[in-house]
Structure formats: C-alpha cells, structure tokens
Amino acid sequence: MNSLFASTARGLEELLKTELENLGAVECQVVQGGVHFKGDTRLVYQSLMWSRLASRIMLPLGECKVYSDLDLYLGVQAINWTEMFNPGATFAVHFSGLNDTIRNSQYGAMKVKDAIVDAFTRKNLPRPNVDRDAPDIRVNVWLHKETASIALDLSGDGLHLRGYRDRAGIAPIKETLAAAIVMRSGWQSGTPLLDPMCGSGTLLIEAAMLATDRAPGLHRGRWGFSGWAQHDEAIWQEVKAEAQTRARKGLAEYSSHFYGSDSDARVIQRARTNARLAGIGELITFEVKDVAQLTNPLPKGPYGTVLSNPPYGERLDSEPALIALHSLLGRIMKNQFGGWNLSLFSASPDLLSCLQLRADKQYKAKNGPLDCVQKNYHVAESTPDSKPAMVAEDYANRLRKNLKKFEKWARQEGIECYRLYDADLPEYNVAVDRYADWVVVQEYAPPKTIDAHKARQRLFDIIAATISVLGIAPNKLVLKTRERHKGKNQYQKLGEKGEFLEVTEYNAHLWVNLTDYLDTGLFLDHRIARRMLGQMSKGKDFLNLFSYTGSATVHAGLGGARSTTTVDMSRTYLEWAERNLRLNGLTRRAHRLIQADCLAWLREANEQFDLIFIDPPTFSNSKRMEDAFDVQRDHLALMKDLKRLLRAGGTIMFSNNKRGFRMDLDGLAKLGLKAQEITQKTLSQDFARNRQIHNCWLITAA
C-alpha cells in the first residue's frame, strides 16, 4: 500500500475525500488543503486519471527537522533517491516555506538539489540533470517551522490542466474548482445545463465530461510518474484503456444537451475549440449573446439548471454595471426559467443578493486568494398574478417623484446638472446628481455602528433602483463614497481616466470629470451664486479666489466682466479653468490664471477689484499653504485682506460650507464692512432640502 496525499483548493477537502473513497482509497484523512489516503499501485494511477478535484497527487518520502541548512541537506540525502528515479531522468525541485535558517526558497531548493545529486554521485552513478520546465521527476519540499516534508509529485503539471485548454488562455477558475462547482450545483446529469456567461466554457466542459464518464486525465500527454523508478507501465495502460472505453460508451449513451453563451465572440470561439479538444464538442451549443438576450432554450421543458461564475469586479467603477447585471439575471430567471435551478459562484455575496432570490444552499471555497461562495436557488414557477418584487421600493418611489419634479424644472432653467436626491430618506443615505445623461451616486460613508455588509447591500439596492427608475445604461452611472472630511478633499485623486463631459449651465458651457476626483469640477449647490456673479459682473474687474475649476469665472466673463483674475493653488484645476474659459470663447489677455497659495497671494497683492468671489475651505493645513486655515476663526482676517483689494463701491461674495458658521458682524463693522446673508436666495429647488449645504454673504463697505 502506498501512502499518498492529494492537494486541493481550500474548502473542497471533504468533497475530494468522498471522490477518493469512491475510487477505492482507504484510510482517508482530511487536512487543510488536501487529503491523506492509502492505495495500491492501481489506485495511484486511478486517482491521477479520475480525480476531478485534486490539484496534485503526491507520494510522501519522509520528513526531517531543519535547524540549519546542513540538516536540510542531510535529511534529503537520507532518502534512497536511486530507488526513486534513474540517473538518466531529469528532475526539478519545488520548495515552499521559510524559517529562521532557510530564508529564501531558491536557496532551499538549491540545497535539496545538491543533496539529491550527491546521493547519486556518492554511489558512482551518473549525475541527474535539472530541467525546470519539463522534468521527468518533480520533488516537492514544504518547510513549516522546523519540519521539512519531502514528496514526489506524481502529477507533473497540476491536474487542473486537463489537456483541452490552451495554457495561454486566461481562466477565472481552474478546471478542478470548476468540477467542484458543477458537483455542488444541484444539477442532475441528464437534464439541461446552461451557462449564460460561459467564457471559455470551463464549467460546461467539466459538466459534460462528468456526465459522459470521461476521465479528466484522459487528454493529458505528460505525467510526473514517467521517470518514477516504481512506475508500472502495464497497470497504467490498463487504467488508461478502461478510461477510453468508458468515455466512448458515456458519449454514445448521453442524450441531454448543454448551452453556453457570452457577449465576447473571441472567448466563444475558444470555448468551441476547448469543447472539441475535450471530446464533447457535439454536446454543447455555444452562442455569442449578451445576458440581456438570454432566453430559455427549452420553454416547454424539461427543467434544467443555470450555472455560472459571473464577473464580480474589484474596482468601484465597475460595480454599477455588475449590480445591473445581477438584477437583470434575477428578473430573467423569474420571468423565463420558472421551475429551473440556478447556481452561481462568486467572490461577492453582495452582488448575488441583487438577484432578489432566496438561496436554498450555499458553499464556501477559495479561488486562489479569493474567498468565494456558491449559492443554489430554486426558481419558483410564475403565476399570472405574480408581481415582480421592488428593489428599495421607498427609495425608488422618492427618486421617481423627484425626477418628475426636477426634470421639467431643470429643462425650463436651462441646466443639465442638478441634484435628484439628497438623503431624503435616512435609511438610503446617498446623493444622486444628474450630469446630462450621466448620473453620479455618492454614498455618505455609514457610521461604524452600522453593519458593513448590510450597508453595502443597501447601496447595491440603491444602484439597482437608480438604474431602473432613471432608465440609464449601467455604464452611465458613477459610484463614489464620500466621507466626512476636513479641507478641500475635492483635490483627492481617484483615477486616471481623463474623460471629460461638456455640460450646460444657463448660458455657460463647462467641463466636468465624473470619475477621476471625489468632486466633479462643478459644485451644483453654487449654481445660483454663479448666475448672480454673472449678472453683477458687467464692466467690472472680477477676482475669483480658491477658484477650483473656474466655473464662477466663466459666468463672470460671459456676464461682461472687464477682466477676470482666477487664483488657485492647484495647477490641475487652473488648467481645467483655462479649458472652461476657452470652451466659452473667453481667451483674451483680460482673463488671468494665477497658481498660488491664495492666502499668501491675498496678503501680497496690490490690485483693485470691483467684484470678488471667495469660497475658501472650511479648514486647511495643506503642506503647500503657509498657515493652517479655519474659516470660522480666520474669516475676519480674510475680510481685512479682501477689503484692501476692494475698489470703492465694490462687492465681496463670500461663501463657505461650514455648518453652523457665524459671521462676526461686530468685527466686520470695526473693519468698516457690512454683510447681508443671501444663503436662501442661492439655494435652488434641488438643494432646498439641505439648507445647510452652504452659507453665502454679500459684503460691502459700511
């Protein structure tokens, strides 16, 4: 009897144990990452040929304590290597694990290689050669703390390489994991199986091979036992011949069918090739088709199973499309696949909840480093009076109501950018802004007392409902998370897409960027303030401090300002402001752009202006600014400096976002200034629900 070890992906150990026992293995013991078992020589070959779940089959050779590199060398050399393989065979060493002595896996592999070579040369036998790419023998060494475990890898290449897939092809799941997904899906052999996002067809091919009794190792051309000294070619040929006979019989007797589709024509072509190489191409119909076009291939029966590994996405900007995809799949299943089963494997349980289906079973597994879940559902047959469940119904109803109200108003006002929803309902804590035919959803980060999973699921419901109510394409929705922050965090960069969208605000044309920054380049709540500046600017010299992207300057320029001066510390935003000015034909020398610390520039400037707009940060301690700034503490000093630049009869429009800001009217009076609060006049309909979003003042000489 041989003592053996079969490795597998985390989470599949019990499934592998059952499979090995069915093959005839005895004394099976599950450990993390695999199963120890025993079997005769025939069982060795059968496990290699027939295991759909094992990553590798190992023949353990021994263990040794490693307190020094010499311990490792002597421990390896103690094994009788001349009984393991002939000197004419090539070998390679795979070494994993480190300890205080062996701190580099390459060094560990070198010591093992030296010990094996010396074991042959000490017996005056030819020195075996190393072949890292295609060795006859693979030696695996695992070092855990002070113990090294040494084994022969009888598989050679990993057993997930069945021989039907081009190694250069990209596969999101290995064939061994795909087989486990099929086994856990609840699909019954002989019933239809459909994968609407099949990619290169791995799930369907593994299912078809299982259904037709085709051994997963049947198409492999190379094995790790070919150079093993104890290899019994006669028994191997018997195992191989039996597998070939069973495959022919299974294919001839199988009567059901498999269906695969994907939106990418190239991967569908690869799937067809893979299925043909696997010997089951005639059983699978592949189509180029988007999920939105998915229909039941057997509307009159029999019932079957939809099985897939849908995309899950790690980038925030991909989530809206994925949420829409899963929501759509859920609706299609309910509408067209009543009575069928559904099984999805995903790294995102939150996305699976967008299906709006209740799972009957679920399994956990690892896909490489990713924690994944497989959920199985039974889709109830629909009845004539069945009504589709609403996602985030209260939110959807409020958004629909707001849309009806604001869409007409915005059209009459001549604006393309406006707020549709602003945390109107506390449990749906987001802002929804429309930019022409795009939508930005900003999630206000939930407090730490809220369960993160529930908060994420609520956000996914919001995304699905937003796409549905507004009737937009998922790729026209941008998702952002906004935390309460200090200073001008609109300068925080989120991406590098560099995609700009031209929008209209009254008579101004402006560039916005919806993806690369936390803010978009246009503060929507200041829309009326900008219009007022345009109306006040005719024939005047205009100064815009903390200018951001210069949208207020554009309105002043279009309003007939004699000159404009735009000051900001960010080169990025000044270049943006220049683009905005150019877009509106404001290109003459009278429109100056200055990159500077606004507070320092203000103290040193000696020019005069008729109209000044300043919208400073609530707080800033930027390294590029000389001093920390607090708008509540420092606004009087700011007004003192501004007064020096204000021409007689001039006006300062002062705005900030500090909640509870208190203007020091007595202090202003001592400076010879007076203030008129115009906050309510600057709040348009879409911001009437949030009266503290900013405060705004007109300041003139007393």
From Swiss-Prot:
GO cellular component annotations of the record: cytoplasm
One GO MF term: 23S rRNA (guanine(2445)-N(2))-methyltransferase activity
Alphabetically ordered keywords of this record: Cytoplasm, Methyltransferase, RNA-binding, rRNA processing, S-adenosyl-L-methionine, Transferase
Catalytic activity, EC: 2.1.1.173, 2.1.1.264
SUPFAM superfamilies for this protein: S-adenosyl-L-methionine-dependent methyltransferases (SSF53335)
Assigned protein family: Belongs to the methyltransferase superfamily. RlmKL family.
Protein name (database record): Ribosomal RNA large subunit methyltransferase K/L
Native source organism of the sequence: Shigella flexneri
Source species taxonomy: Bacteria, Pseudomonadati, Pseudomonadota, Gammaproteobacteria, Enterobacterales
